């Protein structure tokens, strides 16, 4: 299979633009509803999280699955109608509730009401956690700072190893990956109530590392072909470089994606959204490395050549 990327680069850019536009629209709607581009989880907003499971060792305690409507009725009675509710556990015998910050008396009152409605709860398997709003803001600030630092470090690294225009388009590709992933989860937040937490920031940082590595491999091949290859146009050189590294890109994406799909299908509730973040981000990263970063570089070098600028790579061969 041979790709002629630059002949159809307008198509690749249009696909990316459409995905990003859909995500931006969703984030705007999310901001109107949640005052945030994505639906924030407990880690960022602060509040109380209750993860409760029935005690199935008691006779007839687990005959029927827990119904969300039953839980919501209790929450309404406790004036906690805005809470997020999710049925969890084997055979739907558990429930996860995220709500506003509750004091000890309010927690006790809620768990007693749930016990009366749902049956005896397993104390050992049940958990109640509280995250203060100050800690939530600190987590968000730290996550954003980590993203900014990572982008800055990547610009420096790629500029030193290659040239600044390589670094510029590598960053454009990374922004593409982050925006596509954020847009996807913004849509999930609006349609399915999916929240993002501190693991989402970790996922974005992991996606950035994966994507820039893929881009650097392609850029390295482009540079080598420019130095030692026959006289070709920059578009031909980039197409050849992408095709030379295509097998490696596909294999890397498959070997990282398949385990993540397994985690998403068979993993626990906590890991599912994290695995989905990486699946979406790695797919976007593989796409941007092949179809965005490389074609943007070719387009820019063509413009430079028409303007009479020197586009020869003078960066060090190895670092």
From Swiss-Prot:
GO terms for biological process: intracellular protein transmembrane transport; protein targeting; protein transport by the Sec complex. It is found in: Cell inner membrane. The chain crosses the membrane at residues 11-31, 140-160, 168-188, 199-219, 250-270, 274-294. InterPro entries: SecD/SecF_arch_bac, SecD/SecF_bac, SecD/SecF_CS, SecD_SecF_C, SecD_SecF_C_bact, SecF_bac. Keywords: Cell inner membrane, Cell membrane, Membrane, Protein transport, Translocation, Transmembrane, Transmembrane helix, Transport. GO terms for molecular function: protein-transporting ATPase activity. GO terms for cellular component: plasma membrane. SUPFAM superfamilies: Multidrug efflux transporter AcrB transmembrane domain. It is a multi-pass membrane protein. It comes from the Bacteria. Part of the Sec protein translocase complex. Interacts with the SecYEG preprotein conducting channel. SecDF uses the proton motive force (PMF) to complete protein translocation after the ATP-dependent function of SecA. Probably participates in protein translocation into and across both the cytoplasmic and thylakoid membranes in cyanobacterial cells. Forms a complex with SecD. Part of the essential Sec protein translocation apparatus which comprises SecA, SecYEG and auxiliary proteins SecDF. Other proteins may also be involved. PANTHER family: PROTEIN TRANSLOCASE SUBUNIT SECF (PTHR30081:SF8), PROTEIN-EXPORT MEMBRANE PROTEIN SEC (PTHR30081). HAMAP family: SecF_B. Belongs to the SecD/SecF family. SecF subfamily. This is Protein translocase subunit SecF.
